[in-house]
Every structure is written in structure tokens, then in C-alpha cells.
Amino acid sequence: MTVMALYISGQSTHGSQNVSLNSDKNSTLLAESVIYNSSAHVEVENGQKVAKGNVTEVGMIKYLMDSKVEVESLIHRRGQDGTFEFQIPFNSSRKRQTSAVRLTNGNVRVFLKGGPDFIIDKCSHTLDAQGKAVPLSEEQKLDLMNVTVVKQYASKCYRTLLVAYCDYTDAQW
């Protein structure tokens, strides 16, 4: 599977247009969400790094690798003891996957990945291009769902996923 389009920081890319994730302030969160909500891994075959696992997850990891994101370090951290607080795998009835990760500062970050119609309702904010959380109104949610996601992506039969996160202090957790 290949990533055909991406919507990040209010910008949409299509086809061969490639957003430079290294220059986007939200790229680390995107990469972490993809890696921590994935069981895919990277192997070396004939001197080349190759992503292995679920085809959707492999497509997303290949996109990150093509965007020069250091996925191996994230995958390594994913495998360390104590990183995960809990994980609920994706299934067809829930239409989402949830992973709670203990951060190095002691806080917990919960990542969601799944069908946009199941994730968007859980969101209260979005990140702007500078990485700042700004409120996400019901009107903006509808616009994202009906214009950005449905018209641009789902109407082209793209498998469409949304990622989100929420941070908790240790006391809140």
C-alpha cells in the first residue's frame, strides 16, 4: 500500500507531491502516532531497509521512511519495557486503535488511529502549522469530514485514517 495523500497542519498533499515532514512542527507527533499504533517493523533485506507487517501500517511507515523520518529509533523505543501503559489493537467493530505511551518526562500520551468518523468526535483541538493547539469547532469538524476527508480522499477510494493524541500528567493518569 502507498500513501497517496496527507493532510497535516492545515495542508493537503496529493499523489507525487511530497510534504517534507522534517520541516513540519507536527511531524514528530504524526510519526509517533503511526509507530506506536502499529505492529509493523523494519528489516534489512539485501542491504535495503524494508517495512514488514500489516499492509496499511507498512504503507505509512514507508511514507515516513521516504520522508527521512528516523523510524528505527521510534520502533526501538516502542519495544522497550515500560513504554506502553496499555494498547487496544485495531479491530473492525471499533474502527480504531489506541496506545498509551509513557513519555520520558513521566507523562502519558494516548494515541488514537482509525476511521475519521470515529476519531474526529473525540477531538477538541487541532494543531496549527506552528504546532500550537487551537480549538476545533463543530463546524470545522464537519468541514474536515465533508470537504477534506470525504470529498478529497474517500471519494477517490483511498483508505482514510485519522490520528490524534492527548497528553496526561502522571497525576491525571
Write out the residue ranges for each language-model feature.
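Conserved cytosolic headpiece of P-type ATPases
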Residues: M1-W173
